[in-house]
Curated annotation (Swiss-Prot):
Protein name per its UniProtKB record: MEMO1 family protein Pcal_0028
Protein's organism: Pyrobaculum calidifontis (strain DSM 21063 / JCM 11548 / VA1)
Domain of life: Archaea
CDD domains with a match to the protein in the record: MEMO_like (cd07361)
Family: Belongs to the MEMO1 family.
Pfam families: Memo
InterPro entries: MEMO1_fam
NCBIfam families named in the record: AmmeMemoSam_B (TIGR04336)
Length: 281
């Protein structure tokens, strides 16, 4: 079995299990966190959503909102996590079809059946473990998943070719696979929002992008990001989840929490935006 060791434990999150658990509980209880590990359901069924991937001390309280919301719907069999490939390593659209990833909480196994279904539906995706070797955007979701849900599997997908056409093709391939899989799966887009501008600028730019996400308008999201120079590192993964949501009949999106790194660090001159957004029906 291929075992991926943590790349950012001790940097983005604590490397000891007890300290990591305390950090996640800190995130839940934080002033801008959800305050509870389980939130009331919106509608009847959730697909998943958008979740940030910065260091837990910055984005953990916002990330906790999505996981607490999903906990209200019950545990899935599997998470599919689409993240940006920040390093441009490996295939333009990469998947791992087998193996496990290790965190301080233990191993999370890849769902080989679902990974194979996704890969069979999209000829451009490549089974490429190297693409994930340094990438944090997917790794940082796993301790949250392990804290909230026991004995679940996952499928990692990393994307550096973040075009609208690629995003749509990937979203449709995932939707087709989920219809064939016929078990509960949560689909996540791991993304931060605007980068390295003052708090007020980041909030204003993020609001424009979030508005398009809530409208389930993936083309509009790419348009406003381009026209207003909104640096959303996971815009492709977000667009793919929007497309999958529409394909699968999840026509509602709710903003659970929006904040910036300035809200957690107190430093507001150069900030990064974070949002937790839920797709449901």
């Amino acid at each position: 079995m291929r075992i991926r060791k943590p790349a950012v434990a001790g940097y983005f999150y604590e490397s000891r299990a007890d300290e990591l658990q305390a950090r996640i509980e800190w995130s839940i209880k934080h002033e801008i966190g959800p305050k509870a590990p389980v939130l009331p359901k919106l509608g009847t069924e959730a697909l998943g959503g958008v979740v940030p991937h910065a260091g837990y001390m910055y984005s953990g309280p916002v990330a906790a909102w999505l996981y607490s919301a999903l906990a209200g719907y019950g545990a899935p069999t599997t998470f599919v996590i689409i993240g940006p490939n920040h390093y441009g390593i490996g295939a333009p659209v990469a998947i791992m079809k087998s193996g496990a990833w290790e965190t301080p909480f233990g191993r999370v196994e890849i769902d080989e059946e679902l990974a194979s279904l996704i890969a069979s539906n999209y000829r451009e995706i490549e089974d490429d473990a190297h693409a994930f070797s340094k990438e944090h955007s997917i790794e940082v979701q796993l301790p949250f998943i392990q804290y909230y849900f026991k004995n679940v599997k996952f499928v990692p997908i990393a994307v550096w070719r973040q075009t609208l056409s690629t995003s749509r093709e990937l979203g449709k391939a995932i939707a087709k696979a989920l219809r064939e899989y016929k078990r509960r799966v949560y689909l996540l887009a791991s993304s931060d929002f605007n980068h390295y501008e003052p708090h007020d600028v980041t909030v204003k730019k993020d609001d424009m992008a979030i508005g398009k996400i809530l409208e389930l308008d993936e083309a509009g999201l790419f348009d406003v990001a381009s026209r207003f120079d909104i640096s959303i590192c996971g815009i492709g993964p977000i667009a793919s989840v929007i497309v999958a949501a529409k394909e699968l009949g999840f026509s509602n999106a709710a903003l659970l929490k929006h904040a910036t790194s300035g809200d957690t660090s107190g430093y507001r001159d150069e900030t990064v935006g974070y949002a937790s957004i839920l797709f449901y029906k």
